[in-house]
């Protein structure tokens, strides 16, 4: 999906349109800080529909694998992306109203020029772990050289206290 796909989200939902494709991880610029490398692609499906009350919705599904940087050892860790979410499209007037907590899914503005790539990137960012890391013991994280051999900053105080 190197060319940005722009949809009129209310019309897309009303028509029940389905958009499928792949998105290269390298195209998601806001992910660069957490990625180990930008290899791979994510498959996506965006489906428009209306709920029982006639309100437009988008169903998103994103699947694939990307390589994040482990925060323990700074090496690569494979992260499976498996997103299935529902977004209700709301007009400007609806956005100002009280939100029903029983309502499933999130609410986004109904946009006549919605960038699908940006929407998918937003969902991937929201699904990422706060601090990606390998399982305990599976990581090659080692203390920095010399760490542990240098006395702590309060060791002199501990000696004075003993005297």
Segments from the language model and where they lie:
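Charge-rich, low-complexity linker and terminal segments
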Residues: 1-16, 41-43, 78-163
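A positional/architectural concept
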Residues: 1-67
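Immediate flanking context of iron-sulfur cluster ligation sites
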Residues: 52-69, 122-137
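Conformational-control "hinges and anchors"
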Residues: 73
């Amino acid at each position: 999906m190197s060319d940005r796909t722009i949809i009129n989200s209310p019309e897309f939902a009303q028509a029940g349109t389905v958009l499928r494709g792949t998105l290269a991880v390298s195209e998601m610029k806001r992910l660069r800080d957490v990625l180990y490398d930008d290899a791979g692609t994510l498959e996506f499906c965006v489906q428009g529909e209306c709920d029982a009350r006639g309100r437009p919705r988008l169903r998103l599904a994103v699947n694939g694998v990307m390589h994040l940087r482990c925060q323990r050892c700074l090496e690569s860790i494979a992260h499976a992306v498996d997103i299935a979410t529902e977004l209700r499209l709301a007009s400007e007037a609806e956005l100002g109203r009280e939100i029903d907590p029983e309502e499933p899914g999130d609410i986004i503005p109904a946009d006549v020029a919605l960038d699908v790539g940006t929407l998918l990137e937003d969902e991937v960012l929201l699904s990422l772990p706060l601090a990606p890391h390998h399982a305990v013991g599976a990581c090659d994280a080692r203390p920095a050289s010399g760490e542990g051999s240098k006395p702590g900053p309060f060791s002199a105080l501990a000696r004075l206290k003993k005297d």
